[in-house]
Every structure is written in C-alpha cells, then in structure tokens.
Amino acid sequence: MASCAEPSEPSAPLPAGVPPLEDFEVLDGVEDAEGEEEEEEEEEEEDDLSELPPLEDMGQPPAEEAEQPGALAREFLAAMEPEPAPAPAPEEWLDILGNGLLRKKTLVPGPPGSSRPVKGQVVTVHLQTSLENGTRVQEEPELVFTLGDCDVIQALDLSVPLMDVGETAMVTADSKYCYGPQGRSPYIPPHAALCLEVTLKTAVDGPDLEMLTGQERVALANRKRECGNAHYQRADFVLAANSYDLAIKAITSSAKVDMTFEEEAQLLQLKVKCLNNLAASQLKLDHYRAALRSCSLVLEHQPDNIKALFRKGKVLAQQGEYSEAIPILRAALKLEPSNKTIHAELSKLVKKHAAQRSTETALYRKMLGNPSRLPAKCPGKGAWSIPWKWLFGATAVALGGVALSVVIAARN
C-alpha cells in the first residue's frame, strides 16, 4: 500500500506494485547520455574539432580546453532527447473540492479510449484503505456500489467519477469525507484521515426498476436500508434519510414483472421498516412535517405499530401539540404497558401540557383584565352577557311596538 504522504521530490519511491515509470525514464536518459559521452570522447581523439560550434573557434583558449564546453553541451542535449516521448501518468495531485481535504493522484492511467462512469451507474472497484501512517486497515477486491447513491463514504462517491475505467488512483481524504468522529470500529479510529488506493474495474448502467423480480427488489431495498443504517450509526442523518428514500423507491416503483403474494408481503414489511427508520432520521434533523408524514404512512399499513405511534407522539410534542400527542402515546402504552421509554415520554408530556394550560389561563386573564378570577367554562362570557341582554330586550320592545301598531291599524 502506498503511503498517504505526498512525495517531496520527484525521485521519491512510488507505491509498491506500481511500475516506476518516471524512474525508468530518468534512468534511460542517464544511460543514453553516458553512452553518447563515451562516443564523443572517442570521436574527439580522432577529430580535428571541425564539428564544434563556431563559438569555440575564437582562438582564445588552447584546443584541449575548448573540447570541454562542446562536450558538456552535447551531453546536456543528449540527456534531453528522451523527454519528447509520451508522458507517463501525471504525478500532480488534483484538489477535488478546492479545500485541500480531498485529493486524487493517478498512479496507473486507464487504457486509451476508456470512459468515465456517471451518476446512477453501478461500479466495481478494488479498494485498499490505509491510515495516514501507512497502516493498511481494509482491502476489498470487489466493492460494488451505485455511483451517487451515497452507498459508500463520500471520498469514494466524489473521486470515482473522476477516474477512467481501468485506472488506479491514490485518494487522500479528511475524516469528514470518510467515517467522521465515530470512526469504524475496530480498525478505523475516530477523526481518522484515510489514504485510499482505488482501481476502477467496471462501470455498467444501473438496473431498470420496472423489470426487477420480487426477490431482486427485496435484495436492492435491503442493500439501501443497510447503507442507511450505517449512515445513521455514524450520526450522518442526511445520508441515512437519502438511503432510506432510495430503498422505498425501489419497493414502491411500478413493476412489469409479476410477484408472488409472499414477495409482496415481504416488500410491505421492508417498506414499513424503511419508513420507520426514515421517520427517525427526519426527527433527528428536526424535519417534523416530513417525520409526521412518514409515521402516518406506517400507521396506514400497521395501525398498531408501536414505533410509529411513539415517534408520531414525539413529533406532535415537538410541535407543541400536547393534546394530540398524549392520546397517541397512551395508545402505544396500551399496546406495550411495560415499555419504560413510553412511560417516561408520556409522563413528561402530561407535565408539559399542564404547564401549557396554566400559561394559557394566565394569558386569558391578562387579556380580559380580570386577574382575580376566570369563569370556568367560557372565558369572556361575563364581559358580553349584559350587552346581549340589553340587545335582546330592545329587540323585543321594538317587535311589540310594531305588532301593536298593526293591530290598531287593522281595527281602524
């Protein structure tokens, strides 16, 4: 495995197993120069210096001393002759994001005419992972993932699109583009920058979801769900939500292939799991409306799903809807009376709801200008009772007067 440190001089050793193309070129140049120098010395013994440039014929130095500048010039030119040959793989580091935290260097270029993968294609890579000190911690000969789906660490998702098929590259990545503050136990410690040696083997188009069989859909959705779980464990809730969304898309997309009843039931169970996990990720991100929608979708399929009931109650509580959250948590507790988590959450919400009602009562009293007491049933009833009585009385008197006038007019 190659070292993560950037070579300080052009003559520094290259990674093990990588042909030292640059070193071979330098050695070839030196050998050619030495051979030509020997031939020049033999020719100089036989020549009368008629081959030298006109500058050496000025006559100031002796003839023996004039031979040295010409020989050095020819040696310099001879050493430069091999350089017009096709250049080997570039040694320069490409700063992918412009912040110096994610860099790529080509070790072995892809064959002529090879193409680069695009988002949505399924790629296969050979991956060797090392720490900054050169300690190899992981090797995966056949790592398969969908480009752009966040199935792997961001360092791979961002660097592989810049590689040709058949290319081998070195990628150095800061921990934020790898496994972050959690690391990956037991081999990758927290906040570890990594050095990745990547060989892009193949790149093919992704599957057509409509043409997948039931078992292929289950396998694809399970892979995306597992990727989401890995992101969730690293507290990367944005990527986790993205993976769960992709799993749900694989399950719910239209199908042109018939499925058995067992496969449909299996997909439904998998959809419920993904929706529950998606709601958990959205709750961590404070996306309450989206989390509420995910929980409601679960409850449409399974009205007694305890996880969905509990999370829906938490979402409503976060929105301040205690009067709606408490009945939902009570329903969840009825399904699982021994659940201490639901007990604690319900007790907390009841206290918050009581405090909320007390605050609202004090606010009503302040608005009505009567802080001493508040009518039990309808705040504000006393303030409007007298005016309405006067209004009804005046209306009755007016109607009575009209009726009396009609009667008198009829008699006349």
Swiss-Prot record:
Compartments it resides in: Mitochondrion; Mitochondrion membrane
Post-translational modification: Ubiquitinated by PRKN during mitophagy, leading to its degradation and enhancement of mitophagy. Deubiquitinated by USP30.
Keywords for this protein: Apoptosis, Calcium, Host-virus interaction, Isomerase, Isopeptide bond, Membrane, Metal-binding, Mitochondrion, Phosphoprotein, Repeat, Rotamase, TPR repeat, Transmembrane, Transmembrane helix, Ubl conjugation
TPR repeat ranges per the UniProt record: 221-254, 272-305, 306-339
One GO cellular component term noted in the UniProt record for this chain: mitochondrion
Numbered residues of crosslink Glycyl lysine isopeptide (Lys-Gly) (interchain with G-Cter in ubiquitin): K249, K271, K273, K284, K307, K314, K334, K340, K348, K351, K352
Membrane topology: Single-pass membrane protein
Ranges of Acidic residues composition bias in the record: 22-50
EC number in record: 5.2.1.8
Record flagged with keyword Chloroplast: no
Additional notes on this entry: Binds the immunosuppressant FK506 only in its calmodulin/calcium activated form.
Name by which UniProt lists this protein: Peptidyl-prolyl cis-trans isomerase FKBP8
